Amino acid sequence: MQYPRPIAKLIEGFTRLPGIGPKTASRLAFHVLDMKEDDVLEFAKALVHAKRDLTYCSQCHNITDTDPCQICEDKHRDRTTICVVQESRDLIAMEKMREYTGLYHVLHGAISPMDGIGPEDIKIAELIKRLQDDESVKEVIVATNPTIEGEATAMYISRLIKPTGIKVTRLAHGLPVGGDLEYADEVTLSKAIEGRREL
């Protein structure tokens, strides 16, 4: 059976989201149709506002509604340490543990030659410029995901930063290899920060 065009378009829209296949998209579409109209309009408005009102911090490249973001603006944070993460959601995972008090740099991806993603496609050049412009940074913690791409990115960053004399460390591997940082619990992340090693 073919769906009416509006439902088909809605299902197609949901399948564009990561991890959403046709069955889940269909389930979500029919759930939306069962919702009260006010709730659907509120949901649609939230989507539009998030897309329209959010931007990226000009310093750390985290998603934010102010520029610079709250973390970069916070004068109480340790400005001698920058934690490099792949995505904004990884930064949020690090913040949840409430132990790391330094600054961040969001790469927006990882080096992945198989996917055609090179160093120039993520925010590595911006990180290097930031380190050149700010002499107070003494340590860069590379907190990329423990995947092949994350490891390759960590090694690439380490090779660029080492000659500057800035200490480069990597999170300890209490984190599962092949896993994503955002799914790690606070205790695991805390142990990983404590056990970080120099690259």
UniProtKB/Swiss-Prot annotation:
Zinc finger (C4-type) in chain: 57-72
Gene3D superfamilies: 3.30.60.80, 3.40.1360.10, 6.10.250.240, RecR Domain 1
Keyword annotations of the record: DNA damage, DNA recombination, DNA repair, Metal-binding, Zinc, Zinc-finger
InterPro entries recorded: DNA_Rcmb_RecR (IPR000093), Rcmb_RecR (IPR023627), Rcmb_RecR_Znf (IPR015967), TOPRIM_dom (IPR006171), TOPRIM_RecR (IPR034137)
One Pfam family of this chain: RecR_C
PROSITE patterns per record: RECR, TOPRIM
SUPFAM superfamilies per UniProt: Recombination protein RecR
Lipid biosynthesis among keywords: no
Cystine bridges: none
Domain Toprim: 80-176
GO molecular function, one term: DNA binding
GO biological process: DNA recombination; DNA repair
Function: May play a role in DNA repair. It seems to be involved in an RecBC-independent recombinational process of DNA repair. It may act with RecF and RecO.
Family classification: Belongs to the RecR family.
UniProt name for this protein: Recombination protein RecR
Organism: Shouchella clausii (strain KSM-K16)
Gene transcribed to yield this protein: recR
